[in-house]
């Protein structure tokens, strides 16, 4: 049976992008997830080719962007993270919950809840997974490529986060 992301979580929209520069191909998968607890490792196990046994994500933090996880699997290097509706990007459910507890107690969220349109906490996320093959580059160079692409991607989508 498929792994649940959280009790009420659902992937509303999923998109796949591929970018080519010289001999390097960058693949990006983005899913708009509702009702999530923000556990990226759990989402990776439940929704991607990493179902088999993804191992542990190595966590990293970029100032002004937030957290992301890096994982090498077979001949690819992956970067995965959740763009939050407010607050920096997160990888673990603890980071996601911290953002919700510190960012969502606002008048507009309270009004949203009082009108019966949802929870005070905004449990949505733009779950992004990027990857590059390791045949054309080494893991250190691949990590730099992924992190540079991630910063641009994050800045673009953070400002365009969908309305609830």
Segment roles from a protein language model:
Residues 1-116:
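Short, solvent-exposed recognition patches
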Residues 119-122:
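Accessory, solvent-exposed terminal regions and/or long lumenal/extracellular loops of proteins
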Residues 124-164:
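Surface-exposed amphipathic alpha-helical segments
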